[in-house]
């Protein structure tokens, strides 16, 4: 990751671009992945790692780290606060990042861990994006959006992103 400050700066920069410096409405779709670390599918994660890493020793090492996590839900989850977990969730979520940018063609997308925003001047466009996002997360990554944490609002109404309210 590149840190909260970069994400916050990009948020402001994107909001300025989408709103054409406050000359038009900037809509923001804000979402949160439900039980993020606990829901990471270990098999899917290893398959993603195998697509990017050819060295079998490295793959085995990552597999051991992933499988060392004791969970009530077998084959699911990564330990919170572990440095390798932070790297691995970004490897995992990179699949989603690529989908949002290249398949959904969303230029103004920012993700920080399990929180993400997509900005657009067209509210209906963002409404149409929601089922696509849900389907991809569900089918490809076995993740779900937190049902109470999907918000569609204008930037001027004040958007809480990463603990900072932007308007």
Where are these regions (language model features)?
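Active-site and adjacent loop segments of nucleotide-processing enzymes
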Residues: 160-167
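Conserved polymerase palm-domain catalytic core
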Residues: 2, 6-113, 117-153, 158
């Amino acid at each position: 990751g590149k840190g909260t400050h970069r994400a916050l700066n990009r948020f402001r920069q994107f909001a300025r671009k989408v709103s054409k410096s406050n000359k038009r409405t900037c809509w923001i779709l804000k979402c949160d992945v439900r039980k993020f670390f606990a829901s990471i599918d270990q098999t899917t994660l290893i398959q993603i790692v195998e697509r990017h890493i050819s060295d079998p020793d490295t793959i085995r090492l990552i597999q051991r780290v992933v499988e060392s996590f004791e969970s009530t839900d077998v084959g699911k989850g990564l330990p919170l606060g572990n440095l390798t977990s932070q790297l691995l969730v970004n490897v995992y979520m990179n699949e989603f990042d690529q989908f949002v940018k290249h398949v959904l063609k969303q230029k103004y997308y920012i993700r920080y861990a399990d929180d993400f925003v997509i900005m657009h001047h067209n509210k209906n466009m963002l409404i149409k994006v929601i089922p696509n996002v849900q389907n991809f997360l569900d089918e490809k990554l076995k993740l779900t959006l937190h049902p109470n944490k999907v918000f569609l609002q204008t930037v001027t109404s004040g958007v809480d992103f990463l603990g900072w309210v932007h308007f």
